[in-house]
Amino acid sequence: MWLETRRANRVNRLELAILSSGFVIRLLFGAIEMKIELSPWIILCSGLLALMIAVGKRRSDLEQLSTQNSVTRRSLRGYSLEFLDQVNTLLASVTIMSYLLFSTSTYALNSIGNGVLWTAPFVIFSILRYLQLVSVNKQGDDPTSMLLGDNITIILFSIWLILFTSIIALIILATTIFVFKN
C-alpha cells in the first residue's frame, strides 16, 4: 500500500494501523462518491475487521517464518503467536460489540429499522469462523482466498446479505405503501 513505508514496517503496530486505515479510507471515498452517509459504527467495524485480517496475516507470516528460524521482516520481531492470537481475540470482541451497537443505534433504527439486530448472529459466527481458519486451520497467509474458498464463510455471508437486503427491501416497501395510502 502507498502509505506503508520502510519506517512504518519497522514499527509493527504502526504498520498494522496504516494497513487497516487504507481500507477505511477506501470505504469513506466510496461513500462520498456514491453520496451515502455512513454510520460511525460501520466505519469502526470496517476498520476493526481490516485490522483483524491484517493481524491474521501477520500471524501466518510469523508462523511460516518460525519454521525457518529466521525473521526477515523487521515488523515481525515485535510479535509472538500468542500475542497475535490475543490481539485477534480482542479485535473480534470489539468488532462484534461495534456491530451490535450499530444494530441498535439511532442511525440504524431510523434508516433501516430494528431488524438489523437479527443479522448479528451471522456476523458473530463469521468472525468466529475467521478466527478458526487463522488460528486452528493455519490458513491466514492469503485472506482473500481463505474467505472466498471457505464454504461455511460463503454460506454465513450469503445468509447475512440476504437477510440484510430483505430488511431494507421491506422498509422500502412499507414506506412506499404508507406514502400511497396517504
Q: What feature does the model see in each segment?
A:
Residues 14:
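Catalytic beta-strand/loop signature of glycosyltransferases that borders the donor
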Residues 17-19:
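A mobile, often basic/glycine-rich helix-loop segment
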